[in-house]
Amino acid sequence: MADDGMLLNFDLGSGPVKPQVKFKGGRWRDRKQAEKSARIASGKQSQPKSSTDGPDDGRSSKRQRTDDGDFDNGFDYKSANRFGSRPKHFDNDGHGGASGQSRSHQSDGKSKQVISRLFSFNPAQKTEADEKQGEWTAPEATNAPLSDVANFGTLTISARLVDELGKMGLERPTGIQNKVIPHMLTSSSDAFVQAETGSGKTLAYLLPILHRVLLLSVKGGAQIHRDSGAFAIIVAPTRELAKQVHTVLEKLIRPFPWLVSTAITGGESKKAEKARIRKGVNFLVATPGRLADHIDNTKALNLSIVRWLILDEGDRLMDLGFEDDLKKVITALKAVDVSDTLPDGTPLKALPERRVTVLCSATMKMNVQKLGEMSLADATFLAAKKEDMELDVQKSEMKAPAQLHQYYSVVPAKLRLVTLISYLKSTFSRRGKTMKAIIFISCADSVDFHYELLRDPNTTEAPVAASKEAESISKTVSKAAYITSPASPEVVLHRMHGSLSQPIRTATLKSFSACKSPSLLITTDVSSRGLDIPSVDLVIEYDPAFSFADHIHRVGRTARAGKPGDALLFLLPGTEEGYIELMKGSTTPTSQSYDSILQKGMMTKLEFPVETTAKPEDGHSFHDKAESLQLHIEQRLLEDTKRLELARNGFKSHIRAYATHTKEERKHFDISELHLGHTAKSYGLREAPGGIGQGVERKTKKRTNKGVEKDPEQAAGDERQNQNIIRKKSMMLMNSAADEFNIG
């Protein structure tokens, strides 16, 4: 055959040709292991190429990965937005100086110290921050005592009650008290009371009840005693609110030893509660579940004398799922005839002829209207202002007190933690008086992490006087680190959430209320309703509330009874900025940039409670100090296994809680826009932990009866049915409002 000029570019070498072995059968892992062993035996295992190899000379070198899991440009590509696409808008370098210094520190090659860059590759803020802020002038307080009313005596209540109110520092009634007290003193009709938070609803219904009961004891004071029966039942949604109402009631009846009140709540001993009911009580403050339990099981609880049923915080009662318990209570009361006399024959002419139900709520949501239809009959609508009474109930919305100064700060996720510490440090440093602040966080695990992080590790005992409650608060009260200053050398830190036992929660709340030093409470929404804590100057919503109604109740912990107050809301750049328009429906919020917060907080010297390699110097800019603080926290967590685990758990719970906002507001909190890597930075983590949203592990093999084999079609049908059940439960969870599991 003639030579056709073709050349074969094959070099088979001089060695014998070995046949290719293909592994079949067995498990996948076994086949892979066998292939790897064969490659090693044949000398064909891949080796790293030399840097002098010709074909690779033109390839660009990869960016060096630092110890914290990030490339040298400061962006966490690995964890970027696992739920969706990467956020579109990023500033290449919002603060070039800080970013440039960070690069120079790493590029010198002499130091391998990790640099936590916080000011580069952050999402761009969509709304413009208003930096032209003057001194904010508070408008006229909407929940303050009325100036045109001389005192409580003008409302024709008992003079001894007026004296007790004077000892409590209360001289004049508020607007809602001026409406409700005269109505309940003279009328026997049901009432719906609508008023903003902090307006004094508790005294509005307690004072007329006590006045009418005291009229029975005017002549001699011997007709009424503790075993005369329960005249009023007050239902509160949370244990803390029930305890607070009971405390106020105890102060009011102090001059009347023949009157007795008690509180029955979940978490307490039912045996002790039964003993108190058996001895006799005149005023019963209860949570719905425990009250329904005693109605079923405590025979000593006589409902025939009950003249008033007060449903406090009706919207929260329905939100927390107490509808069935409330139905049971209302049905039991309706089934009992109202007695005209006491068991000893004393007439009850001063009391209403029928049982009166009073529903208190700050909103007129559909579930509240449902509760009203279930409990009220021909009710009178009472509000503080005439214009509120003329509003259509479908359009009435909650509003915060007018004198409350609300402002917000759009903070990138990476900067949230250092911004929070800076704000607390500057706040406590400029206050020369005793002050209290509350931080609201979305979940209990996150509360535990932030408490342990801000707690001074060198403090072993709670900074309170020795008492029987000292042991209860030993793990919930401590001296604070990072946020102290020469003006406030000692700040007392508290934590509270629903996972703590009731005695610990009660003792912690009491400690925070009575604390004489500057103090900070880190809590969930368990502290957002009805609690009247004195001298709260500031509320920080570190995590936005699950619903706007919860937001109003959170900020309502300050600016109570006409006093001024401040509230700061942290928001992320992006979809969360749409929440600002929702806020403008009830107030005029003021913006504050995170740069100004960091600059004020980093003016004073930072003091670290634990020594690490990160040591901020006074001469550096506030950008450098913020990055040094972040690096210090990361190093501290790496050296402390306990706090590192708390940070991981807090991060996971935070992500899960982020998906539980109400359906109407979920557009502002899009989890697909949440950057997990940057959010992990706010927990002092260098990379986002895994295991989010995996759910419960399920076994692949299903148990079947021995000797019985399921029909394939039947098995497939069962599987589809189980999947439908899981899907329905998931949809119910996603579409529902925040429940008690969200509040810790």
UniProtKB/Swiss-Prot annotation:
Location of the protein in the cell: Nucleus, Nucleolus
Enzyme class: hydrolase
Locus of motif Q motif: 150-178
UniProt feature, compositional bias: Basic and acidic residues: 27-38, 56-68, 706-721
GO cellular component: nucleolus
Motif (DEAD box): 312-315
Catalytic activity line of the entry: ATP + H2O = ADP + phosphate + H(+)
Assigned EC number: 3.6.4.13
Listed Polar residues bias regions: 43-53
Chief place where the protein resides: nucleus
CDD domains linked to this entry: DEADc_DDX31, SF2_C_DEAD
Residues bound to ATP: A195, E196, T197, G198, S199, G200, K201, T202
Domain Helicase ATP-binding: 182-382
Spans annotated as Disordered: 1-113, 685-724
GO terms of biological process kind: rRNA processing
Pfam families linked: CTE_SPB4, DEAD, Helicase_C
PROSITE patterns in UniProt: HELICASE_ATP_BIND_1, HELICASE_CTER, Q_MOTIF
Keyword list, A-Z: ATP-binding, Helicase, Hydrolase, Nucleotide-binding, Nucleus, Ribosome biogenesis, RNA-binding, rRNA processing
GO molecular function, one term: RNA helicase activity
Domain Helicase C-terminal residues, every copy: 416-614
Function in brief: ATP-binding RNA helicase involved in the biogenesis of 60S ribosomal subunits and is required for the normal formation of 25S and 5.8S rRNAs.
Misc note: Present with 1460 molecules/cell in log phase SD medium.
Assigned protein family: Belongs to the DEAD box helicase family. DDX31/DBP7 subfamily.
Record remark: domains: The Q motif is unique to and characteristic of the DEAD box family of RNA helicases and controls ATP binding and hydrolysis.
Protein name: ATP-dependent RNA helicase DBP7
